């Protein structure tokens, strides 16, 4: 496979260096830990600190959501691997202004374990850290055990809304509460058309046959709900939207925000083709689309596919979603 790589074993380090140089007006590397990137103005006096983190390979997640009125720091892991507990701890300490720290991350075993270890270590230093995990992946666990679901593209809404609440002076508990409310009202589904390949491995870590698609695939290639024959885009879009709405069960007349993310190798043109039918389906269900985000928001290296995320809104979530924000991955 042909790639723009120096040494595959050091691609994350090279990427972080480039990211920080390109966005030096917003982010910088932590002096305490090279695997922590923080907002240039962090810690912000009088504000709850916000931290996220996760494995590399999902860019712009997670680096891209550090910035003004967004996350204050990110712990950076190797490709598809959790950041270390030390990286999370150093991220917490780098953004604490005395108001506590909210850690908002996706629901994966390694992240859960390392965040909890870091929280215990921070507590010994007198820093209070509370957390919320994104659990939006409808394909990863049944509705009855939603707390076991993985976090995928829905994390973007959690970061945007949590960041806005903190920027507006919310307390730690208020930030945690609104982040959890966002998670509780967010559902996502992914469809994969072709696999991804980790640079150091050099070949795909799973296969999708030509003419097939994997419905409900995970962001690391986790098996989906099933493998199906490839369909026209309008049929795929409707199947994705139906899967999300059937699980969410929003009341008729509800307003929603929609995020359509490519998975790394998907032309933006095709995301708009999908979205055209997604909105038509949502309107048929009596839903009103309030805000739309289309592009690469949470990817999976070079996987060809798409993620659909829907957030059911209320007045508070609408206000926070609209609040000014600027980071490499999103600007409002």
What do the predicted segments below correspond to?
Residues 134-174, 178-185:
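Short alpha-helices
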Residues 112-126, 145, 270-276:
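Short Gly/Thr/Asp-enriched flexible loops that form oxyanion-binding sites at enzyme active sites
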Residues 168-273:
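Mixed-charge interfacial surface used for oligomerization/domain docking
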Residues 243, 248-332:
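C-terminal non-catalytic interaction/assembly regions of soluble proteins
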Residues 2, 48-55, 71-74, 100-109, ...:
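Short glycine-rich or small-residue beta-strand-to-loop segments that form or flank ligand, phosphate
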Residues 1-50, 315-332:
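N-terminal amphipathic/basic leader segments beginning at the initiator methionine
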Residues 74-79, 123-148, 285-289:
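Short, acidic/small-residue loops that bind anionic groups at enzyme active sites
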Residues 58, 67-98:
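Glycine-rich oxoanion-binding loops at beta->alpha junctions
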